[in-house]
């Protein structure tokens, strides 16, 4: 298993790309791509890390 890492935010002004490249967050939720996870983290106080690439 790879170590947990933070989601890398791209400066997508128009939102996240509609590319399905799932990542599994440390909250046990599968996000459709790293950008989506990053966007969700901006709304949280405690960021969710990427547990692994691929669905949970």
From Swiss-Prot:
Record's keyword terms, sorted: Disulfide bond, Protease inhibitor, Secreted, Serine protease inhibitor
Domain Kazal-like: residue ranges: 3-56
Subcellular location: Secreted
Marked site (Reactive bond for trypsin) residue numbers: 18-19
One annotated GO molecular function: serine-type endopeptidase inhibitor activity
Disulfide bonds, paired cysteine numbers: 9-38, 16-35, 24-56
GO CC term, one of those recorded: extracellular region
Record-marked site positions (Necessary for sperm binding): 20-21
Summary of the function given for this chain in its UniProt record: Serine protease inhibitor which exhibits anti-trypsin activity. In the pancreas, protects against trypsin-catalyzed premature activation of zymogens.
Protein name per its UniProtKB record: Serine protease inhibitor Kazal-type 1
Organism from which the protein derives: Sus scrofa (Pig)
């Amino acid at each position: 298993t790879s170590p947990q890492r933070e989601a890398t935010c791209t400066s997508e002004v128009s939102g996240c790309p509609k590319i399905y490249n799932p990542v599994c967050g440390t909250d046990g939720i599968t996000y459709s791509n790293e950008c989506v996870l990053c966007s969700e983290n901006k709304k949280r106080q405690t960021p969710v890390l990427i547990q692994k690439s691929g669905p949970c």
